[in-house]
Structure formats: structure tokens, C-alpha cells
């Protein structure tokens, strides 16, 4: 590469400045003489430290080039494997793609839970700021705030119709909200500590809650009365989720176990213990994924001829585990997150698993091959929650960075 006379002159002056400022006096005077440099104070200021600056900026640019090259390779790969640019993927295989469609700000403390409405194009977020916010995920517009709790809200579920929203809080209460009038219609007291999780049973008549008081309680929606208490966990119960038909509920705890309970008898049907730290989250596999799971894990079809049910769990041991509840066996362990796993669920197509964690990422797993197939650097801080829309191609995440992000899938 040939330098112009001006560039050569600038380079020589920068070299001279470098030699002099680093104490190479002899080399400086020889170089100055040979390069026929006329150094004066004004010029000296202009070239002070220039060589080092150029050197570091070259390194920075090289790093940027490498980053862009890897993004380009990723895009090429997506193109050849039929990404959004290549032939159209089957919607069952659509996964979230960066960058996010919307980053929504409004909460004044970490976001603890995000969920989609089952019918309308809205989603709801809960936060440590004791509020629930409603957003339109198609336009990114903020719609309203629901206030009533006096401490951090830990969990929010809708019933299947979307007319009823439940919430639970560190203020030890559970609230039911009429999602048409946006009013709190009932407050339930009964737990002796932080209520960390709540879920509405599929029939809509009862709700279940889990607490730091080590119990799980079942409540009647109509009256607000506690009708059952499930005891057995030895520590804080982090999450509770009913299965599709409401005959079983699963729970996970700081005691490092996942338990499955028979609702009718309150008996603990299975205690799943292989995690090595607090189990933060659980999720039931939808029946649409049963055949893929059986194929991927070679799990035996039982005498009844029906596989499953299957359950996912995510833990502070940084792993995700898949369980066959009927046998109590751990079918697989997915390793890849670099910090506590905070949310896990099945892709609505049944072939993939999505998870979020304190390593600030959202990950998509191809469980058939037990590998992480996509990692999205989702937030500036821990990712606390995620939800996948049942019918529309959207994923939503919430974070300690106080934002809610909407990701489009394709």
C-alpha cells in the first residue's frame, strides 16, 4: 500500500512523537534528522499520542469486523437453512429473532413476570414496583397500570378466557382482577410469607398458590376460601403449575426438588430430585409435543399406550431437565446457560424448548439433539421471565433492567 506524501509526513511525525515521549532520545534525533522533520510546539500537540490512538483503534475495528463477519455467517446459514430470507419455514419451527420488535419501559423496578393474554393482542407484566402493566404487543403501546399490592408482585396468570387475572405478592396476598373492568374483585389472605407463584386451574373454579411458607394452597375463585393445603416441601416453594386437565399440579422449591401432586387426594405422586441447587421454574409439556419427546428420548410407551406426562424444570445449577412424571425419570439435561435459569417452556410447535436466565440470554433448544440452537442476548441484566404466544408468532421477556421486550418469530 502506497502512502501519499501528506500521510507519510503525518506518520513520520507520529513516530517521532512516540519515540520522544517514550524516552528513545537517540533514536528520536536520528529519525528526525533522516526524515527531515521540522518539529515545533504547535505541531507536537497535534501528534501527541497519535500512534497509540491509531494502533488501538485498528484493534477495535478488527474486533468489530470479526463480530460483523460472524453475524454475516449466521445470516448466510439462516438463508441456506430456510430462514426468513430463504424458503419459508413451517410456522411450527419459527423461533424468536433479534433484534427485538419493542423494548418497553415504564416499570420502576425489576420486571418479575410477563404473560400474553389468551385472546386479545395484549400482554401483561408484573414488577417489584408493586404494579401490573398492560401493553399492546402489536403496536408497543402502553395501555394501563393495575395497582393494589403493597409489595413486589411475583406471578400473574390468566384464566383460559382471559377475563380473570390473578396476582400474588410479597405482601402475602393473592388478588383476583376482572380483566374487563380492570378492577380487583377479591383479595385472599392465608399464607404466612411471600407468595411466590399463583396459577388458575384449567376449569377456572380454583387457583393454586405457592409460598415461602413452604406450602401450596388451593383456593375457591367464587368465595376466596382456601380449600386445600399441600405440604411436603422443606423450603420456599418457588413455582406451582397445573397440568392441562387439572388433575395434577407440579411445584419446585429451594429444597432442590420438583414435586408432582394429585389434586384430588393431595398426595405427592412424584418427588424429582437431580438438581444441585434451587429449582426456579417448571413447565408442563403440551400434548402436541409428546410424540417428539418420545422419539427424542426413546421413552417407553406405557401399557395405557399414552406417553407422558412430561415436565421441564430450570434451576440455579444452570441446567434444564426434562422429566417423565409417570416413571420419575430424568430424560435429559440441557447444559449451556452460564447462570441461574429463571424461565423455561415448550415452543408451541412442540419441537423446541425456550429458556431465559441470569446470563442475560434467551435460548432456543433443539431437544431432539440436546443442543442450544440459538442464543439471543436479550437484556442488559438478568432475564427473569418469558412467555410464548399460543397462536401468534411472538415471544415476550422481562428483566431486572426494568424493561419488557417483544420478539418476533419467523
Curated annotation (Swiss-Prot):
Residues 1-66 are annotated as: Interaction with NDE1. SUPFAM superfamilies: Lissencephaly-1 protein (Lis-1, PAF-AH alpha) N-terminal domain, WD40 repeat-like. InterPro entries: Coatomer_complex_subunit, Dynein_regulator_LIS1, G-protein_beta_WD-40_rep, LIS1_N, LisH, PAC1-like_LisH-like_dom, WD40/YVTN_repeat-like_dom_sf, WD40_repeat_CS. Residues 367-409 are annotated as: Interaction with DCX. Residues 83-410 are annotated as: Interaction with dynein and dynactin. Residues 56-82 form a coiled coil. Dimerization mediated by the LisH domain may be required to activate dynein. This is Platelet-activating factor acetylhydrolase IB subunit alpha. It comes from Pongo abelii (Sumatran orangutan).
Amino acid at each position: 500500500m502506497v502512502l501519499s506524501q501528506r500521510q507519510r509526513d503525518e506518520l513520520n511525525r507520529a513516530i517521532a512523537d512516540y519515540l520522544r515521549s517514550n524516552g528513545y532520545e537517540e533514536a528520536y534525533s536520528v529519525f528526525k534528522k533522516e526524515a527531515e522533520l521540522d518539529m515545533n510546539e504547535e505541531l507536537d500537540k497535534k501528534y501527541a499520542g497519535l500512534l497509540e490512538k491509531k494502533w488501538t483503534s485498528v484493534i477495535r475495528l478488527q474486533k468489530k469486523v470479526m463480530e460483523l463477519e460472524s453475524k454475516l455467517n449466521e445470516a448466510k446459514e439462516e438463508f441456506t437453512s430456510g430462514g426468513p430470507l430463504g424458503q419459508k419455514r413451517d410456522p411450527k419451527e419459527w423461533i424468536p429473532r433479534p433484534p427485538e420488535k419493542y423494548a418497553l419501559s415504564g416499570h420502576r423496578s425489576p420486571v418479575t413476570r410477563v404473560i400474553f393474554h389468551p385472546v386479545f393482542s395484549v400482554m401483561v407484566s408484573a414488577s417489584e414496583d408493586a404494579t401490573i402493566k398492560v401493553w399492546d404487543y402489536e403496536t408497543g403501546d402502553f395501555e394501563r397500570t393495575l395497582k393494589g399490592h403493597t409489595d413486589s408482585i411475583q406471578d400473574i396468570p390468566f384464566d383460559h378466557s382471559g377475563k380473570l387475572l390473578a396476582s400474588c405478592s410479597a405482601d402475602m396476598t393473592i388478588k383476583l382482577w376482572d380483566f374487563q373492568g380492570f378492577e380487583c374483585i377479591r383479595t385472599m389472605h392465608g399464607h404466612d410469607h411471600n407468595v411466590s407463584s399463583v396459577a388458575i386451574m384449567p376449569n377456572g373454579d380454583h387457583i393454586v398458590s405457592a409460598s415461602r411458607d413452604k406450602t401450596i394452597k388451593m383456593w375457591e375463585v367464587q368465595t376466596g376460601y382456601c380449600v386445600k393445603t399441600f405440604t411436603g416441601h422443606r423450603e420456599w416453594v418457588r413455582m406451582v403449575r397445573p397440568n392441562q386437565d387439572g388433575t395434577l399440579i407440579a411445584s419446585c422449591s429451594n429444597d432442590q426438588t420438583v414435586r408432582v401432586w394429585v389434586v384430588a387426594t393431595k398426595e405427592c405422586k412424584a418427588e424429582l430430585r437431580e438438581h444441585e441447587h434451587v429449582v426456579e421454574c417448571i413447565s408442563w409439556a403440551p400434548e402436541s409435543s409428546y410424540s417428539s419427546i418420545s422419539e427424542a428420548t426413546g421413552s417407553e410407551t406405557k401399557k395405557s399406550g399414552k406417553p407422558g406426562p412430561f415436565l421441564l424444570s430450570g434451576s440455579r445449577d444452570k441446567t434444564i431437565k426434562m422429566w417423565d412424571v409417570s416413571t420419575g425419570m430424568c430424560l435429559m439435561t440441557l447444559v449451556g446457560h452460564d447462570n441461574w435459569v429463571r424461565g423455561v417452556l415448550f415452543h408451541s410447535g412442540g419441537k423446541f424448548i425456550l429458556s431465559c436466565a441470569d446470563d442475560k440470554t434467551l435460548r432456543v433448544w433443539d431437544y431432539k439433539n440436546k443442543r442450544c440452537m440459538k442464543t439471543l442476548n436479550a437484556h442488559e441484566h438478568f432475564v427473569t421471565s418469558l412467555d410464548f404466544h399460543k397462536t401468534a408468532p411472538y415471544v415476550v421477556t422481562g428483566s431486572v433492567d426494568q424493561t419488557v421486550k417483544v420478539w418476533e418469530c419467523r
